């Protein structure tokens, strides 16, 4: 698996149906291996409300290059 639960990730492309854009930051909540490697990612607003929650293929995500504890205290 490329990512772990609670990893901070950013999107590598737009997801127009959900309002998520390339570069938006989310949190991995779960991982899947079938039929393809994918991750359930939650995207939150600045006030902490969930904006979107859906599965994304691993090729469309990148790990954040900052300390995990900074994102998930």
Where are these regions (language model features)?
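Basic/aromatic-rich interaction segments and small domains that mediate binding to polyanionic partners
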Residues: 3-67, 71-72
